């Protein structure tokens, strides 16, 4: 059986981290925690 190259392992690790951070960002922006976010334009009515 052929062993995987270190570059492939690093690439898959980086891809997993990027996808995890993207998923966390989408969850923060549109999930339940988004109710706590403030809109700065609503805070400064003229």
Curated annotation (Swiss-Prot):
It is a single-pass membrane protein. It is found in: Cellular thylakoid membrane. The chain crosses the membrane at residues 7-27. GO terms for cellular component: plasma membrane-derived thylakoid membrane. The keyword Thylakoid applies. The keyword Transmembrane helix applies. It comes from the Bacteria. Keywords: Membrane, Thylakoid, Transmembrane, Transmembrane helix. GO terms for biological process: photosynthesis. May play a role in photosystem I and II biogenesis. HAMAP family: PSII_PsbN. Belongs to the PsbN family. This is Protein PsbN. It comes from Synechococcus sp. (strain CC9902). The gene is psbN.
